[in-house]
Amino acid sequence: MNNFLKHNDWARDPAFNHFWRHYDFSNQWIKQHTDASRQVQMQMVQRDNLSTEQCFSDSEEPEVIERLSRCEIYSEIENEESDIEEMSEEMKAFFAKTQEHRQKLKEQRAAEKRKEGQSSSKSQEEYVNVDKISIRGRIEQSTDHRNASAEFIAKREKAKKDYGESATKILAMESTLAMKFESEYSQNPQLWPNIPFRF
């Protein structure tokens, strides 16, 4: 395993630490499981005073044969040297590309955070009492020039996209409702409370 890490720089990247911890944990589990299986087998053999071959060849249980074959496989794996084959060029390119994408995404998120920080510091809103807020909401003072025709065109395009053919009807109903509100509001109605409290 150490040879593999020596020859592959990408594998030592901190992004893969979780993977290597999991890999080590899995190897430890396999070794412990193999040791426990061997101990159980040895106890069975000693108890019956038979060799392992006789013990398992006499039994006709397929489970026992399967367990023995698994234990042999684990012991073979354990006995072999832990030299892992070199990675193919495609795999190396894949990991390099993945790391590059992660780095770009990290930089993009950092830039967005910086941008949000700058915009929030610019637009520190002042506290406004409720009685100072008009019926149309809070009107913010801005030095930016408002392009009403561009806003109207954008609103119309959005309505076409959202409502399809009936977009013109819906925009007309919105305009009618806004005009009725303005005509009522121009008469200075009592806004609150609109019903008398008589207890």
Curated annotation (Swiss-Prot):
Residues 72-116 form a coiled coil. InterPro entries: GEMIN8. Pfam families: GEMIN8. Keywords: Coiled coil. Disulfide bonds: none annotated. One of its GO terms (cellular component) is SMN complex. Residues 98-117 have a biased composition (Basic and acidic residues). Residues 98-127 are annotated as: Disordered. The keyword Glycoprotein does not apply. GO terms for biological process: spliceosomal snRNP assembly. PANTHER family: GEM-ASSOCIATED PROTEIN 8. This is Uncharacterized protein F10E9.5. It comes from Caenorhabditis elegans.
